[in-house]
């Protein structure tokens, strides 16, 4: 299992809306994530800095990357575009984090 962590941001006035849209996420999105080998997916909000920290365990990098090509993911990105900075393809602006420490 590969561990991935990343940081995104959310607009300062959109914290509550971001959380509302994730609780619960669309069932079809949860299904796509699981079917593509995503496990233990969490997102944490740092309200003071408007940062989102994501963590997910994936079965393979290729399967994780394939999620972006699904219709439901494309629709989700559009749905979230008004609450967070996005790339021209509507994907959230995201930076991978380097692992520093792990205790099993």
UniProtKB/Swiss-Prot annotation:
Transmembrane regions listed in the UniProt entry: none
Coarse class of the protein's main subcellular location: cytoplasm
Compartment(s) where it occurs, according to its Swiss-Prot or TrEMBL record: Cytoplasm
Keyword ATP-binding in annotation: no
A single cellular component GO annotation: cytoplasm
Binding site for substrate: 18, 41, 76-77
Region named Disordered: 85-104
Sequence similarity: Belongs to the rhamnose mutarotase family.
Function statement: Involved in the anomeric conversion of L-rhamnose.
Name this polypeptide is given: L-rhamnose mutarotase
Species this chain originates from: Pectobacterium atrosepticum (strain SCRI 1043 / ATCC BAA-672) (Erwinia carotovora subsp. atroseptica)
């Amino acid at each position: 299992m590969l561990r991935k962590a990343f940081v995104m941001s959310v607009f300062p006035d959109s914290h509550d809306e971001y959380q509302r849209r994730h609780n619960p996420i669309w069932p079809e999105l949860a299904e796509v994530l699981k079917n593509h080998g995503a496990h233990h997916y969490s997102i944490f909000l740092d309200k003071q800095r408007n940062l989102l920290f994501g963590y997910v365990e994936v079965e393979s990098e290729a399967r994780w990357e394939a999620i972006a090509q699904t219709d439901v993911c494309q629709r989700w990105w559009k749905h979230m575009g008004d609450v967070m900075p996005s790339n021209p393809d509507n994907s959230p602006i995201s930076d991978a984090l380097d692992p520093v420490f792990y205790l099993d």
